[in-house]
C-alpha cells in the first residue's frame, strides 16, 4: 500500500522554489525535486506531468495572491490611482520574487509558447478592476496592457501613471 505524505504537493512546490532560488531554473529537475522531498520521481509526476507544469503551478499560486490584493485595493477605492499603484506594486513584487525564472534564457525558451496563450488572460485580469473607472472595455484593457508592459520594462510608477491618468 502506498504511503500517504501530508501536503506533498505544497512540499514539492516549496522545494522547487528553493532549488530555483539556489541554483536557477536550468538546474532544477523533477529528479532533484523528488530527491529533495524524499520521494520517487514517479510520485512527482503524479502531481505534475512536467517540470514546466510544476513551474506554472508555482507561478499561478503566487499570481492568485496578487489578484486578491488588487481586488481588495479596487473594492476599497473610489479613484483609479490607488488601484493602479497596487497593480504596479503587485507586478513588480511578482517579477522580483520570480526573477530567476523570468530572466533565465532556458526558462524563456521553455515558456515562449505559453506567453501568448496567457497574455489575454493576464490582461483581462488586470483590466477587471479598472473597468469601473473607464468609459469602455478597450480602454481598461489598453491601460492594463500598458501598465504590464511598462512595469515589466522597469519604468517608474509616477511616470507610467502620468500618462495613464489621461485615459480615465
Regions found by a protein language model. Name each.
Residues 1-23, 27-36:
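Basic, helix-initiating cap at the start of DNA-binding domains
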Residues 31, 42, 52:
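Residues within the helices of the helix-turn-helix
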Residues 27, 50-55:
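Short amphipathic alpha-helical segment with a characteristic S/N-K-E followed by hydrophobic residues
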Residues 37-48:
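Short hydrophobic/aromatic patch on the recognition helix
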Residues 6, 10, 14, 18, ...:
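Generic detection of well-ordered alpha-helical segments
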Amino acid at each position: 500500500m502506498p504511503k500517504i505524505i501530508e501536503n506533498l504537493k505544497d512540499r514539492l512546490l516549496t522545494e522547487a522554489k528553493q532549488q530555483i532560488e539556489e541554483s536557477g531554473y536550468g538546474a532544477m529537475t523533477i529528479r532533484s525535486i523528488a530527491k529533495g522531498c524524499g520521494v520517487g520521481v514517479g510520485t512527482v509526476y503524479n502531481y505534475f506531468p512536467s517540470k514546466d507544469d510544476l513551474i506554472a503551478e508555482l507561478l499561478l499560486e503566487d499570481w492568485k495572491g496578487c489578484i486578491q490584493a488588487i481586488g481588495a485595493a479596487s473594492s476599497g477605492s473610489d479613484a483609479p490611482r490607488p488601484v493602479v499603484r497596487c497593480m504596479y506594486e503587485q507586478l513588480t513584487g511578482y517579477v522580483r520574487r520570480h526573477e530567476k525564472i523570468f530572466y533565465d534564457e532556458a526558462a524563456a525558451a521553455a515558456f515562449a509558447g505559453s506567453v501568448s496563450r496567457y497574455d489575454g488572460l493576464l490582461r483581462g485580469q488586470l483590466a477587471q478592476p479598472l473597468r469601473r473607472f473607464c468609459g469602455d472595455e478597450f480602454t481598461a484593457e489598453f491601460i492594463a496592457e500598458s501598465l504590464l508592459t511598462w512595469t515589466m520594462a522597469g519604468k517608474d510608477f509616477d511616470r507610467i501613471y502620468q500618462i495613464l491618468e489621461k485615459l480615465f
